[in-house]
Swiss-Prot record:
HAMAP family linked to this entry: HisH
EC numbers for this chain: 4.3.2.10, 3.5.1.2
The organism of origin for this protein: Xylella fastidiosa (strain 9a5c)
An example molecular function term from Gene Ontology annotations: imidazoleglycerol-phosphate synthase activity
NCBIfam families: IMP_synth_hisH (TIGR01855)
Positions annotated as active site in the UniProt record: 78, 179, 181
Keywords: Amino-acid biosynthesis, Cytoplasm, Glutamine amidotransferase, Histidine biosynthesis, Hydrolase, Lyase
InterPro entries: Class_I_gatase-like, GATASE, Imidazole-glycPsynth_HisH
Lineage: Bacteria, Pseudomonadati, Pseudomonadota, Gammaproteobacteria, Lysobacterales
CDD domains the record matches: GATase1_IGP_Synthase (cd01748)
PANTHER family recorded: IMIDAZOLE GLYCEROL PHOSPHATE SYNTHASE SUBUNIT HISH
Domain of life (superkingdom): Bacteria
Name of the protein in question: Imidazole glycerol phosphate synthase subunit HisH
Length: 200
C-alpha cells in the first residue's frame, strides 16, 4: 500500500480528509514533524484558517525545509494549495514558493459574495493526470476568501467574479483550491488520481 503522509497543519478539515482517504482504502499517516515525512510516497497538505497561522505552524513543526526538498507527489488542499505559492495577501506572508504565483483576496461585488462558499463548476484548461475520468461540467465544493489568479501551472479554473486557479499541477506539485473531501464523486476521483499519479 502507498504510504500517504497527511500533514497536521491545524486545519479543521484534517479529519474529513482522513476519512475521504479511508473511503479510498488508504489509512494516512498523520504528520506533525519532519520525521513523519520519511518513507512517504505521497504527501497531503490540507488547511483551513489563515495563511500566517498555517505558515507559523509549519515552521514550528520543522516542516518547511523538508517540504521544499520533497521529491514525491504533494497536493495542497484549500489553504494548503495557497501555501504552495510564493506569497499571500492574507497577512502579507511569504509562503513555500514551490509554485510561482501570489495569492490574492477575492473581490466582492453586488452579485459576488466573499467568502466564496458552495458548489461551482470546474473549467479544465489543459490535460492533467488529476483530471482523468473527471466528467466535463463537474463541480466541486469551495469555501475561501483568497485565491490564486490563473497561472501557467493551472490545469482547471473556476469563475467567481473572475477566473482563478481551481486545480494546479507542476510536475509532482499539485493543489486543489476546493475541498475534494467534500466534493462527492468528483472529489474522490481527484484524490484517487493524485494517489495513482506517476511519481516521476
Amino acid at each position: 500500500m502507498t504510504e500517504v503522509a497527511l500533514i497536521d497543519a491545524g486545519g479543521a478539515n484534517l479529519g474529513s480528509v482522513r476519512y475521504a482517504l479511508q473511503r479510498l482504502g488508504v489509512e494516512p499517516r498523520l504528520v506533525c514533524d519532519a520525521r513523519g515525512l520519511e518513507g512517504a510516497a505521497r504527501v497531503i497538505l490540507p488547511g483551513v484558517g489563515s495563511a500566517p497561522e498555517a505558515m507559523a505552524r509549519l515552521n514550528n513543526q520543522g516542516l518547511i525545509e523538508p517540504l521544499l526538498r520533497l521529491q514525491v507527489p504533494l497536493i495542497g488542499i484549500c489553504l494548503g494549495m495557497q501555501l504552495l505559492f510564493e506569497h499571500s495577501e492574507e497577512g502579507d506572508v511569504p509562503c513555500l514558493a514551490l509554485l510561482p504565483g501570489r495569492v490574492r483576496r477575492l473581490t466582492p461585488a453586488p452579485s459576488i459574495r466573499v467568502p466564496h462558499m458552495g458548489w461551482n463548476r470546474l473549467l479544465p484548461l489543459r490535460a492533467s493526470p488529476l483530471l482523468a475520468e473527471v466528467p466535463e461540467g463537474a463541480s466541486a465544493y469551495f469555501v475561501h476568501s483568497y485565491a490564486v489568479p490563473l497561472t501557467t501551472a493551472a490545469v482547471a479554473a473556476c469563475d467567481h467574479g473572475g477566473m482563478f486557479t481551481a486545480i494546479v499541477q507542476q510536475g509532482v506539485r499539485c493543489g486543489a483550491q476546493f475541498h475534494p473531501e467534500r466534493s462527492a464523486e468528483t472529489g474522490a476521483r481527484i484524490l484517487r488520481n493524485f494517489l495513482e499519479m506517476d511519481a516521476a
